[in-house]
C-alpha cells in the first residue's frame, strides 16, 4: 500500500449552457467514443423535449429531481468471511450516488423502444422524476437487497 496522501479530486468544468457541474458530468456519462459535442446535443435536446412534454417545468429541474429519485442511499457489497460470501449493506458515498443514478438512467433509457436517444432519455428522466421508470425500480431493488441483508451489516468494510 502506498504511504502517499490521497490524490486530489478531479473536478469537471460546468457545462457552457446551464453552468451546472451535474449537467457536465451527465454529458460525460452519455458520451461514447469521445464524441462530446454529440453527447451535449443529446442532453440539451432532451431538456427541450422535457420542457415541451411537461409544460411549465424546466428541463434542468426535472433532470435534478430524476437524479435525486434514482440515487441509492445504500447498496450491497460482497465480503468473504471464512469461506462464505456475504452481501453486506453499505452506505453509498454522495459522489457514487450521483454516478450510479446517471448510469442507471442511461442504461434504462438505452433499453427503451423509442426512435431516438433524445426521446428515450427524455421519457426515462420524466418517469424517474415522477418516481417511476427502470432507474427508480433499480434503486428500489438495491434498497430491498440491502434491507434483506441487514443481518450482515456488522461485517462492515
UniProtKB/Swiss-Prot annotation:
Q: Pfam families attached here?
A: Ribosomal_S7
Q: Name one GO cellular component term.
A: small ribosomal subunit
Query: Which keywords are on file for this protein?
Result: Ribonucleoprotein, Ribosomal protein, RNA-binding, rRNA-binding, tRNA-binding
Q: Which GO terms describe its biological process?
A: translation
Q: Name one GO molecular function term.
A: rRNA binding
Q: Which PROSITE patterns match?
A: RIBOSOMAL_S7
The superkingdom listed in its UniProt entry is: Bacteria
- Functional description taken from the UniProt entry: One of the primary rRNA binding proteins, it binds directly to 16S rRNA where it nucleates assembly of the head domain of the 30S subunit. Is located at the subunit interface close to the decoding center, probably blocks exit of the E-site tRNA.
Task: Summarize subunit and interaction data from the UniProt record for this chain.
Answer: Part of the 30S ribosomal subunit. Contacts proteins S9 and S11.
- Family label: Belongs to the universal ribosomal protein uS7 family.
**Do you know which HAMAP family this protein is assigned to?**
Ribosomal_uS7_B
Provide the protein name.
Answer: Small ribosomal subunit protein uS7
Which gene specifies this protein's sequence? rpsG
Amino acid at each position: 500500500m502506498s504511504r502517499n496522501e490521497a490524490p486530489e479530486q478531479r473536478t469537471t468544468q460546468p457545462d457552457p449552457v446551464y453552468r451546472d457541474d451535474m449537467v457536465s458530468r451527465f454529458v460525460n456519462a452519455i458520451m461514447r467514443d469521445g464524441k462530446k459535442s454529440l453527447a451535449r446535443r443529446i442532453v440539451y435536446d432532451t431538456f427541450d423535449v422535457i420542457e415541451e412534454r411537461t409544460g411549465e417545468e424546466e428541463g434542468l429541474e426535472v433532470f435534478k429531481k430524476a437524479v435525486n429519485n434514482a440515487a441509492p442511499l445504500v447498496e450491497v457489497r460482497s465480503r468473504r468471511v471464512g469461506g462464505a460470501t456475504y452481501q453486506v449493506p453499505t452506505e453509498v458515498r454522495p459522489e457514487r450516488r450521483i454516478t450510479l443514478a446517471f448510469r442507471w438512467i442511461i442504461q434504462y433509457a438505452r433499453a427503451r423502444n423509442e426512435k431516438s436517444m433524445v426521446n428515450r432519455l427524455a421519457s426515462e428522466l420524466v418517469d424517474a422524476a415522477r418516481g417511476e421508470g427502470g432507474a427508480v425500480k433499480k434503486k428500489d431493488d438495491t434498497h430491498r437487497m440491502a434491507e434483506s441483508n441487514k443481518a450482515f451489516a456488522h461485517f462492515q468494510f
